[in-house]
């Protein structure tokens, strides 16, 4: 997914750097806001692309061109494709997926910290190689218990998100907990 979508990769890189640069609660709140906004925008864009593709498929299957009027007999089925309620539900689901992916990205930072703390880089390598120096600094500042505690904080955030917690509050709380 990251390899084929430049924006998703850019958002991930921005998130990783943002987490590594957390220094105060205001940083955490701003980072959470940016993450939520990016997740919603990404989800809405994906839903629009899928809806447009579904409409094009519907027209093609029914022998209609892009500019042809939809016959009255087919309007109900055509309108069901792009119902606002359904699109909103899909966008919400996709937003949750994007946020879950963000949690995986944040967890990868602390996985890399643990790898460096345990001198296992040669054996398993780092996920976030482009941020190696910042992760190395973080691995020195945190003890092993603190790194594990942050992974537990990420798991707690995931449970809260899966339990329909407010995404903004979940990520603000998480990012505040991650401040070294």
Please name every model-derived segment:
Residues 1-105, 115-180:
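Charged, glycine-rich active-site and insertion segments that engage polyanionic ligands
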């Amino acid at each position: 997914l990251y390899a084929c979508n430049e924006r998703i990769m850019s958002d991930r890189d921005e998130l990783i750097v943002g987490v590594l640069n957390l220094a105060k609660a205001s940083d955490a709140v701003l980072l959470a806001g940016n993450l939520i906004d990016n997740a919603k925008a990404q989800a809405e864009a994906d839903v629009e692309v899928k809806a447009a593709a579904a409409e094009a498929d519907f027209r093609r299957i029914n022998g209609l061109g892009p500019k042809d009027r939809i016959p009255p007999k087919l309007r109900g089925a055509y309108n069901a494709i792009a119902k606002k309620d359904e699109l909103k539900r899909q966008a919400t689901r996709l937003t949750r997926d994007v946020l879950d992916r963000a949690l995986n990205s944040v967890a990868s930072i602390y996985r890399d910290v643990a790898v460096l703390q345990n001198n296992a880089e040669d054996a398993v390598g780092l996920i976030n190689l482009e941020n190696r120096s910042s992760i190395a600094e973080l691995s020195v500042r945190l003890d092993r218990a603190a790194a594990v505690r942050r992974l537990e904080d990420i798991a707690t955030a995931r449970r809260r998100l899966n339990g329909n917690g407010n995404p903004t509050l979940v990520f603000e709380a998480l990012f505040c907990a991650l401040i070294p």
